[in-house]
Amino acid sequence: MLQRLPALALVQLTICLALSLGQPVRADEARPNPWPTGSSPGLTALAKAAEQNRYAYVFFWKTEGEATQRKRETFDAALATLGDRADAISVCVSDPEEKATVDAFKVSRAPMPLVLAIAPNGAVTKAWPLDFQAATAGDGIVSDGAASCMKALQGNKMVLLSVQNSLTSHAGEALEAAAGFLADPRFAQAAEGIVLDPADPAEATFLASLKVSPTTDKAMTVLLAPPGNPVATFVGAVSTAAIVAKVTDAKSGCCPDGKCGPGQCCPGGKCGPSQKSSAKGVSK
């Protein structure tokens, strides 16, 4: 399962990973800069970091004071340990000039100070409300594959993750099935396709969290639903129909007729594209 951000709808992003003609894209492909420049100092700084393919750690604060100063010193010291991998950005949420930044991350009511780690593609990869620890600063830097999946999931989209390379069998069939699913009008706007090389050492930790071996000799296709729950894993050859059936089964099992009733849950606690977004999760 992907790491879940703290239960703050405040840090949800609604930015989508671009697809080309319904085809899955490689996690390491260059992407458009997700941030506008000139709308606020914070977003301009984020755009600069993304342009240089660097992470950004944003220190959100509200009022000056001894406590804020101590937290800022801890933040600065922690960022120094990350070297040139990340830029440090400070945003005062009460500054009118930073309204666009505050609105982008929906942090106006978040407990302060708040630190967010943001990948070059715009995904929030880690959040530290109130208590940022230098020892865990590096946890915000994740692989390209993890960041790509997080970005799509934070946009409330499903992810169809194709794990394959030139050595895995059935790669062509699996990729064709994924492309067919992503081209289906029922899912085209509700899913993202991402391709990962299982032998990429940078993706080892992420793939291990999904129980995918880096030495797999068969293509693997993993379906993820927000906030990061694996719904299904297909090994080797798979068809578009099989993927659609798994999604349909997951939807119909918790939302009969595409409508989420009281006490019903959908994969990841969220309904699919044809379902109501107000579904409540069932308490265990």
Language-model regions, residue ranges each:
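Local sequence-structure signature of Cys/Sec-based thiol-disulfide redox active-site neighborhoods
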Residues: 44-78, 151-186
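N-terminal secretory signal peptides that target proteins for export/translocation
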Residues: 1-7
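Structural micro-motif
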Residues: 54-57, 99-117, 157-160, 204-226, ...
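N-terminal leader/targeting and pre-domain segments
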Residues: 27-54, 134-156, 246-284
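Non-catalytic, surface beta->alpha helical segment in thiol-disulfide oxidoreductase systems
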Residues: 114-146, 224-256
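Thiol-based oxidoreductase modules, predominantly thioredoxin-like and allied folds used
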Residues: 60, 83-99, 187-204
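Sec/Tat signal peptide C-region and signal peptidase I cleavage site
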Residues: 21-27
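Bacterial N-terminal signal peptides
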Residues: 9-20
